[in-house]
Regions:
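Glycosyltransferases and closely related glycan-assembly transferases
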Residues: 89-102, 109-125, 138-146
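Short amphipathic alpha-helix
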Residues: 18-29
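Donor-nucleotide binding loops and adjacent catalytic segments primarily
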Residues: 47, 51-55, 176-187, 191-212
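Glycine-rich, highly charged phosphate/nucleotide-binding loops
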Residues: 78-93, 181-186
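Active-site-proximal region of nucleotide-activated glycan assembly enzymes
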Residues: 37-39, 58, 118-186, 191
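Glycine-rich phosphate-binding loop signature in dinucleotide/nucleotide-binding domains
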Residues: 33, 93-98, 191-193
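Conserved nucleotide-sugar phosphate-binding/catalytic loop shared by glycosyltransferases and other
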Residues: 7-15, 31-82, 87, 202
């Protein structure tokens, strides 16, 4: 029996918190189905345009931008125009690539692709990395078939019947640290292995509160 090749578009980005889970998803898909074709769609000029090709995947950039605060800012007129351009490009990308599935990982780059894919009847999966859902994923929740989350109580943001508690995708080089590597880490950072360590980071774009 002939099996149709899996073709997946993964869209999102803007920050490492979106990009690296997306790459982990792609790696897992390729491991499960080596013949799968995967295409990334990200925002032009953002870090995904560098990180995704470095991981060995093709990416197409679209002119996606996030809304400015306050929302009545005049610059948001340009954001709205760019979003319409993104939707036109998204339709063209989907028609040419013919995906079996579209995965949205959040970030403004995923807004147009997920919206257009849902309207074209293509299955949509969202992946939300945070305990407080991002604006784009919250909006796209109504268009998704399933939503993979990392935390409990996400019914606050998404329809309960669509939620699957999966945890966050983790890169293998992080998840599979050897005991020797762990011991070296404890020693390097002068940590007590018998105590829990809390690691606080501000994200790939930095954090003003922490920096100050």
């Amino acid at each position: 029996m002939h099996m149709e090749k899996l073709r997946v578009i993964i869209s999102g980005g803007g920050t490492g918190g979106h990009i690296f889970p997306a790459i982990s998803i792609a790696n897992a898909l390729k491991e499960e189905k080596p013949n799968a074709e995967i295409l990334f769609v990200g925002a032009k000029g953002r870090m995904e345009m560098e990180k995704v090709p470095a991981a060995g995947y093709k990416i197409i950039g679209i002119p996606a931008r996030g809304l400015k605060r306050p929302l009545y800012s005049p610059s948001n007129i340009g954001v709205a125009i760019d979003y319409l351009r993104c939707k036109c490009q998204a339709k063209k990308i989907i028609k040419e690539f013919k995906p079996n599935l579209v995965v949205g990982v959040g970030g403004y780059a995923s807004a147009a692709i997920v919206s257009v894919a849902a309207k074209m009847g293509i299955p949509v999966l969202l992946q939300e990395q945070n305990s407080y859902a991002g604006i784009v994923n919250k909006k796209n929740g109504k268009n998704a078939d399933k939503i993979c989350v990392a935390y409990d109580n996400m019914e606050r943001f998404f329809p309960k019947d669509k939620i699957i508690l999966t945890g966050n995708p983790i890169r293998k080089d992080i998840a599979k640290a050897t005991q020797q590597q762990k011991e070296e880490g404890y020693k390097f950072y002068n940590l007590d292995p018998n105590k829990q360590t809390i690691f606080v980071v501000g994200g790939s774009l930095g954090c003003r509160t922490l920096n100050e």
